[in-house]
Structure formats: C-alpha cells, structure tokens
Amino acid sequence: MRKSFYSWLMTQRNPKSNEPVAILADLVFDDTTFPKHTNDFELISRYLEDQASFSFNLGQFDEIWEDYLAH
C-alpha cells in the first residue's frame, strides 16, 4: 500500500534546501488543513489551487507528484 502523499512529502523536508519539493514540504508542514490521509491527485491539486494558505507553482507540483508515484 502506497504512503499518503503527505507522509511521503514529509520525508522530503529540508528547510535549508531551495528544491521545490523541500519548499512544498515545509509549506505543507505548516498548513493544518492540508489533506494528510490521501493519495488522490485531483483532491490534493484542487486543495493547492483553491484552499491552501500559501501559493505554489502547480507545474512544479505536477513534477513532484511524478516523483511521488515513482517511489
């Protein structure tokens, strides 16, 4: 069974990194309403687009999602 996207993303946290995945991980870590228990691309993508308390480049999110699927 695949880890939730949130669980995988938390393994990518690195406050000293300028990599998009590390930046997103740190932003999501501080967002208390991020959907933590899902691996549904549409749900997470819509959340980032419409509800997140931060803005993030969705093109970069798509690339991060591909990395998530590869692990």
UniProtKB/Swiss-Prot annotation:
Pfam families per record: YozE_SAM_like (PF06855)
- Tell me the organism: Streptococcus pyogenes serotype M1
Family according to the record: Belongs to the UPF0346 family.
Q: What is this protein called?
A: UPF0346 protein SPy_0467/M5005_Spy0383
Coiled-coil regions listed in the entry: none
